[in-house]
């Protein structure tokens, strides 16, 4: 139901000297309205109407009675029949008929009102009736007329909703864009616009809307959403700039630094985070990042025994059966590859496979472990499970392992 503006009454009070004697009662009614005590407010307006027979009191009482379904609704509707020459009261009657589903009577009142006045509400209610009847083209026509008379958000959203129903996405988008340019970003309009941009894979426009939503609500989730889109676009530098400007978590920073291959910075954050929180996963991250920093670019291996010992120590302190599969596999593969403890390495990789049974990298690690144990037949059987993925099978490491295992089988 539609609720009138309080300013209507305030203006009425200030301009009507004849009603000065009722100011206290009207102010009390306004206070009741402000606090949501609509029955008490309606009682005052109803009494004022009975005492003065003034249409403005009937209008206010009827509006409250209809919008809050109050006890004197029928009484006031009956009384309003003698005041239908007042457009506001006639419109309330149209609303009542609309609410009870008597569209014929509602339309008759509205068409009469449209002849008498160009008030956007007449067209909007008529549009609502057509929308209820699923006559969306007619509804849109009325909403557009109403919107030309008064551009407000609730009307815009009705126009957008029908355009989306009719698959006119570009028209819906344009209406939202035009409104946001004129009136600024609101939560509803910008959220709808964001949804359209995201469905159209328009990351650049989505980021601009997310920035506006962040200014509107100061909610960090919008910054995270921007970072996610920048990652999709592989714009890691700009994403990192946001992590410096806002309070972004360490995991996101570590991820972004690894994407830019700044492993040293990622390593420093991971180690610092471990020292502060004692969360084992950060020590595991530090182990992986230390490997990336110091491995030989050509052989992809650690050649310094002291550095390898430092990495292994980090894994020993942080990786167990409850760890993420990624860390279990990385630690296990390191033990296998460097012939440190092949049996333990296989156990760790099996833990990882319990979590992710179809992970190609983990299967490759397990196959390599059995190759190191000279069980080449089993190694080949396991490696065969990765052959369906051509991209993985064509990787240098996979081809190297397959070549070694096949050579072993011929012995």
Model-derived regions, located:
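Register position in tetratricopeptide repeats
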Residues: 34-35, 64-68, 99-100, 132-133, ...
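Alpha-helical adaptor scaffolds
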Residues: 288-306, 316, 320-356, 361, ...
């Amino acid at each position: 139901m539609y609720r009138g503006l309080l300013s209507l009454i305030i203006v009425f009070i200030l301009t009507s000297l004849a009603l000065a004697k009722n100011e206290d009662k009207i102010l009390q009614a306004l206070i009741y309205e402000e606090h949501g005590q609509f029955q008490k407010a309606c009682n005052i307006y109803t009494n004022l109407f009975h005492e003065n027979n003034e249409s403005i009191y009937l209008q206010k009482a009827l509006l409250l009675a209809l919008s809050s379904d109050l006890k004197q609704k029928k009484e006031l509707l009956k009384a309003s029949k003698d005041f239908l020459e007042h457009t506001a009261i006639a419109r309330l009657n149209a609303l009542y008929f609309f609410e009870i589903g008597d569209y014929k009577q509602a339309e008759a009142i509205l068409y009469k009102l449209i002849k008498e006045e160009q008030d956007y509400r007449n067209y909007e209610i008529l549009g609502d009736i057509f929308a209820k009847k699923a006559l969306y083209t007619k509804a849109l026509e009325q909403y557009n007329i109403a919107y030309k008379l008064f551009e407000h958000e609730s009307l815009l959203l009705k126009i957008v909703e029908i355009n989306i129903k009719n698959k006119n996405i570009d028209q819906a988008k344009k209406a939202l864009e035009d409104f946001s340019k004129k009136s600024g970003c609101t939560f509803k309009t910008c959220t709808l616009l964001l949804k359209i941009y995201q469905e159209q894979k328009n990351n650049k426009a989505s980021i601009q809307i997310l920035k506006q939503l962040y200014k509107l609500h100061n909610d960090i989730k919008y910054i995270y959403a921007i970072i996610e889109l920048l990652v999709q676009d592989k714009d890691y530098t700009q994403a990192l700039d946001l992590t410096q400007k806002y309070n972004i978590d360490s995991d996101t920073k570590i991820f972004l630094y690894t994407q830019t291959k700044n492993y040293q910075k990622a390593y420093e954050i991971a180690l610092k985070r471990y020292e502060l929180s004692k969360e084992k996963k950060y020590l595991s991250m530090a182990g992986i990042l230390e490997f990336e920093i110091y491995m030989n670019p050509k052989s992809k291996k650690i050649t310094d025994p002291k550095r390898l010992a430092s990495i292994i120590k980090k894994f020993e302190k942080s990786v167990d059966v409850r760890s993420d599969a990624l860390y279990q596999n990385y630690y296990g593969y390191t033990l296998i590859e460097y012939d440190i403890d092949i049996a333990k390495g296989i156990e760790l990789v099996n833990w990882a496979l319990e979590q992710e049974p179809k992970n190609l990298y983990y299967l490759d690690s397990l196959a390599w472990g059995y190759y190191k144990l000279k069980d080449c037949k089993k190694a080949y059987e396991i490696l065969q499970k990765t052959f369906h993925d051509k991209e993985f099978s064509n990787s240098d490491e996979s081809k190297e392992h397959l070549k070694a295992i096949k050579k072993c089988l011929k012995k």
